[in-house]
């Protein structure tokens, strides 16, 4: 018997391995830089230069890029140092192969840059590398059966979430920022932060729409010695699109966005004065788009007057439990460690770290930390620019009712981000931190079921056929369907409906039916 089959595509996680890299290195202050009095602020990011699979080992090579803002000795001057530390880590793996999509995510768990003496700094970092191997696979399932011998079949509806689009791409943002008229010309950029805020990316027909803001903060030195330290903040909106030929606006997105390159440089304006900032960033995007389908799957087959041999096999499909885009508004207080008198808050910067995610009956219970840096000006002539760091815990429940089975067997992914962050001085050495944290979650459930793989129709033994009753009077039992009754007595559904004058398929318990045997066996 011929079966019409359709293909179901899914992405299956084959292996995930977590490794930690410890970096500890002394850095010499370049000769062109002033002696270091004390570190004000530092930041770092990782660039993975190479990921290569070699048998049962995954080699990851990259660099930790860091920047330091510091107070110089014997002056009120602020200066900066930039550098990088190379690293290479070999991760032992078991199930990864070259055919898999291998993704390595990084996170800076801890970063500490301390002063050894005025010409040397110590840089310590703890990186977590998470290597995940994904396998794209397809499952064939039977939709219908065709044989021309009067076979009867019944189908069921299967809801599946199929992987429709998987791609990696980059989105480049280039803007020029003009200084306001009350700002002096730029001599040297000492510090900058360029962070994405409130990025939204959604699928459309044939493309991906992306929009959001880049939050720019820049400290610079003016061209004249008597000019005090200058800083500015700007929100740079952007919008655009990326080509994705197979995308449709009904698809369910799972998109990870991370800056992989950031730069802010001073440049001349049309009058030849250093009054512009050339801002550039590159966003790396890992895109997975899912399509929810309701498939009609062949569930059972029989043939009146014949023996039917069914061969089945297990098939695993993904089902979307929930997708949720949440925003958590948090307000907390941050205490200063010393009795600084704050004259002005310059800038607040932060990152979100997810510490634990636990599926519950009510949804995903998320515990995390908002790591905050607040740069401010203190009433201290020797070191006016200072920074306070804090770690603010939060807990949030992503509403998504989960069954006991889903809690144990579901796979979930949560992408966190920061949409808004602000700091306000309360007095008494306290700052009020307000933030809007974005939590985009997707919960999938893998369902394994037996599906019909092949059907063979065999002629019934004539003696067996002759022993079947010619006419049967049957009383409908609870849970009976026309299909079950017809299969039990080797009859056809249409014949039962015609003989009993039934207009539909609905039956009532206690209802009486007359079932007539097929006139001849299958041959």
Where on the chain are the PLM-derived regions?
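Membrane-lipid interaction segments
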Residues: 1-468
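Extracellular LysM carbohydrate-binding repeats and other cell-envelope/extracellular binding modules
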Residues: 473, 491-523
């Amino acid at each position: 018997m011929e079966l019409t089959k359709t293909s179901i595509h899914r992405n299956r996680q084959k292996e995930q391995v977590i490794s930690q890299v410890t970096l500890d290195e002394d850095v010499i202050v370049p000769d062109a830089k002033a002696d270091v009095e004390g570190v004000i602020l530092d930041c770092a990011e990782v660039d993975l230069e190479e990921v290569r699979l070699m048998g049962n080992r995954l080699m990851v090579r990259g660099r930790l890029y860091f920047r330091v803002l510091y107070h110089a000795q014997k002056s009120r001057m602020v200066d900066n140092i930039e550098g990088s530390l190379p690293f290479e880590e070999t991760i032992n793996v078991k199930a990864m192969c070259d055919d898999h999509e291998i993704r390595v995510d990084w996170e800076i768990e801890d970063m500490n840059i301390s002063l050894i003496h005025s010409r040397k700094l110590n840089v310590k970092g703890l990186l977590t590398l998470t290597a995940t191997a994904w396998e794209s696979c397809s499952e064939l399932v039977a939709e219908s059966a065709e044989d021309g011998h009067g076979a009867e079949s019944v189908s069921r509806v299967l809801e599946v979430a199929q992987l429709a689009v998987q791609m990696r791409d980059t989105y480049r943002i280039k803007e020029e920022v003009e200084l306001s008229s009350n700002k002096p010309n730029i001599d040297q950029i000492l510090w900058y932060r360029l962070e994405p805020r409130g990025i939204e990316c959604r699928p459309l027909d044939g493309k991906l729409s992306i929009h959001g803001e880049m939050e720019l903060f820049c400290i610079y030195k003016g061209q004249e010695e008597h000019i005090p330290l200058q800083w500015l903040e700007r929100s740079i909106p952007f919008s655009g699109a990326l080509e994705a030929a197979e995308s449709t606006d009904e698809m369910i997105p799972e998109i990870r966005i991370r800056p992989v390159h950031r730069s802010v440089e001073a440049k001349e304006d049309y009058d030849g004065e250093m009054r512009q900032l050339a801002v550039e960033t590159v966003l790396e995007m890992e895109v997975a788009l899912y399509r929810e389908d309701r498939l009609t799957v062949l569930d059972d087959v029989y043939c009146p007057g014949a023996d039917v041999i069914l061969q089945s096999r297990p098939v695993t499909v993904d089902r979307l439990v929930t997708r949720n885009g949440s925003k958590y508004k948090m307000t907390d207080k941050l205490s200063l460690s010393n009795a600084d008198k704050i004259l002005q808050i310059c800038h607040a910067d932060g990152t979100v770290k997810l510490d634990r995610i636990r599926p519950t009956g009510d949804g995903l219970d998320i515990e995390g930390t908002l790591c905050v840096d607040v740069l401010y000006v203190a009433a201290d002539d020797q070191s006016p620019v200072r920074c306070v760091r804090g770690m603010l815990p939060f807990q949030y429940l992503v509403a998504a009712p989960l069954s006991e089975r889903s809690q144990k067997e579901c796979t979930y992914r949560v992408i966190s981000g920061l949409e808004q962050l602000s700091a306000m001085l309360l007095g008494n050495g306290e700052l009020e931190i307000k933030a809007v944290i974005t939590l985009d979650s997707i919960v999938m459930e893998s369902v394994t079921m037996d599906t019909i793989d092949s059907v063979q129709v065999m002629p019934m033994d004539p003696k067996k056929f002759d022993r079947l009753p010619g006419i049967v009077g049957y009383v409908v039992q609870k849970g009976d369907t026309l299909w079950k009754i017809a299969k039990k007595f080797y009859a056809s559904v249409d014949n039962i409906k015609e003989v009993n004058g039934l207009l539909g398929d609905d039956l009532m318990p206690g209802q009486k039916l007359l079932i007539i045997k097929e006139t001849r066996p299958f041959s």
